[in-house]
């Protein structure tokens, strides 16, 4: 495996370059659950498009977002003094000192919370609880199960074993986009999870037609007719 990067644009998670970067990102989080790894990577798909050199809107500017996680402002990451960073300072050419391995440095900065980006309340002040009421209610469930009731640490996140919850946690605690597009990121997380070797549970298929439960209020003669149609005597073997 090797890191890939380019001055502009992103990589599809099904492309050879995108897949290599997915595996490289996962390798930087050895202690995280598979669910947490998939959540981080899926969110980055919707941020920097799996391209470590990606500038927000494909326009260069230190006040803009940069990299896999769209560190904003870019200057916070680039001037952080973190060892081994190697950003590309252009959207049209490769600048001196730039290296695709900047992706690894970005992941290390994220995983160590080096820049203090983690918001443990798992919500953003610019997200209206009224507008996003169902998502706000889900936040409460997530914090009760995986956090400390009213907050969650990065260490607790890395131990999360629920893919949907992990995707929401990283979206809310680390990325914090203007619009919390959780549903689309959740779908991407399922794809990344499978790429990393996870198996998405398939809900059982109900009988066709469904067998009504005993005591459902349906007349006895109708229950018998349905049971006969399904070629079963389960309701009358008592």
Regions flagged by a language model, labelled:
Residues 1-38, 179-238:
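Extracellular cell-wall/glycan-interacting regions and their flexible linkers
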Residues 70, 81-93, 178-196:
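Charged, low-complexity, helix-prone segments enriched in Lys/Glu/Asp/Gln
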Residues 157, 163, 174-180:
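Residue microenvironments linked to proteolytic maturation
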């Amino acid at each position: 495996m090797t890191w890939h990067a380019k001055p502009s644009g992103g990589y599809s998670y099904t492309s050879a370059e995108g897949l290599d970067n997915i595996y490289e990102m996962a390798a930087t989080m050895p202690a995280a659950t598979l669910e947490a790894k998939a959540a981080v990577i899926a969110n980055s798909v919707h941020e920097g498009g799996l391209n470590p050199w990606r500038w927000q809107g494909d326009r260069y500017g230190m006040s803009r977002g940069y990299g896999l996680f769209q560190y904003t402002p870019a200057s916070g990451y680039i001037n952080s003094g973190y060892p081994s960073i190697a950003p590309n300072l252009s959207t049209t050419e490769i600048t001196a000192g730039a290296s695709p391995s900047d992706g690894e440095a970005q992941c290390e900065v994220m995983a160590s919370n080096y820049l203090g980006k983690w918001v443990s309340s798992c919500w953003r002040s610019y997200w209206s609880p009224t507008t996003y009421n169902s998502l706000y209610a889900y936040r409460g469930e997530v914090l009760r199960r995986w956090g400390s009731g009213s907050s969650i640490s990065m260490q607790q996140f890395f131990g999360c074993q629920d893919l949907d919850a992990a995707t929401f946690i990283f979206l809310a605690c680390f990325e914090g986009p203007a619009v919390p597009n959780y549903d689309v990121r959740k779908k991407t997380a399922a794809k990344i999870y499978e790429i990393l070797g996870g198996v998405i549970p398939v809900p059982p298929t109900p009988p066709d037609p469904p067998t009504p439960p005993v005591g459902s209020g349906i007349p006895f003669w109708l229950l018998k007719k349905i049971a006969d149609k399904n070629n079963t005597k389960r309701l009358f073997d008592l």
